[in-house]
Amino acid sequence: MKEIKVIIAGPRGRMGHEAVLLMERTEHFNLVAAVDYKHGGEKISDLPGMPALDAPIYADLHTCLEEVEADVLLDLTTPEVGKQHVTLAVERGLRSVIGTTGFTEEELKQLTEIAKEKAVGTIIAPNFAIGAVLMMKFSQMAAKYFQDVEVIELHHDQKLDAPSGTAVKTVELIRQNRESKQQGHPNEVEQLEGARGANVDGIHIHSVRLPGLIAHQEVMFGGDGQMLTVRHDSFNRASFMSGVKLSIETVMNLDHLVYGLENIID
């Protein structure tokens, strides 16, 4: 396969560290630079626990793109920074794979239009774990037969957004096969605000944040005399790398924005 030159934004994070290791062990990936506001002017090999890669680190993406030629930006930063990075990348015609979440429908619409206008491939993935993507697809299928459903998502206590992008995407897919309806007793009352979780078109999402967790989600469907549970667990961040690899390879052949890995796997 032809070499793909990659810039990683957010190499110091846990996902970023795994992505750097992915670059090292994948023959056709070439890490040409990284973006980290705390370590501009250093090299990847200067960071604790990193492999001996000489890719330079830039304090900001704008300067990096002025000095480095790349094929793909892999952004694994925070939601706010990720939004800025993908906008800059798309406007400059650089393909990007975005692993941050928190995009609104309006923001996705704007990015989709810009990507189409620039004919630049972009993938925004709420979850890179292939198993999690299958969980979402299975949940979408089940919703045709089970109209009553609730989602419980569980993540580490350092996660910034709630509910997770995976939970939101799961509900979006379920809604495609489910008529809008309110679940539970029509006169139910929350004795404590938020007790029933977030409500999206009658589907409740419950967010759990605890140390020791990585990324987990349970989709519970209830029916007369039966229950169906679809669950996925990521026990470490290596579970996300197969999806990162697939996304980087796939975005090279796209000329538009794709939201969600379920749209690029067969």
Curated annotation (Swiss-Prot):
InterPro entries: DapB_C, DapB_N, DapB_N_CS, DHDPR_bac, NAD(P)-bd_dom_sf. NCBIfam families: dapB (TIGR00036). Pfam families: DapB_C, DapB_N. GO terms for cellular component: cytosol. It catalyses: (S)-2,3,4,5-tetrahydrodipicolinate + NAD(+) + H2O = (2S,4S)-4-hydroxy-2,3,4,5-tetrahydrodipicolinate + NADH + H(+); (S)-2,3,4,5-tetrahydrodipicolinate + NADP(+) + H2O = (2S,4S)-4-hydroxy-2,3,4,5-tetrahydrodipicolinate + NADPH + H(+). This is 4-hydroxy-tetrahydrodipicolinate reductase. Catalyzes the conversion of 4-hydroxy-tetrahydrodipicolinate (HTPA) to tetrahydrodipicolinate. The keyword Amino-acid biosynthesis applies. It is found in: Cytoplasm. It is an enzyme of class 1 (oxidoreductase). Keywords: Amino-acid biosynthesis, Cytoplasm, Diaminopimelate biosynthesis, Lysine biosynthesis, NAD, NADP, Oxidoreductase. GO terms for biological process: diaminopimelate biosynthetic process; lysine biosynthetic process via diaminopimelate. CDD domains: DHDPR_N. (S)-2,3,4,5-tetrahydrodipicolinate binds at residues 156, 165-166.
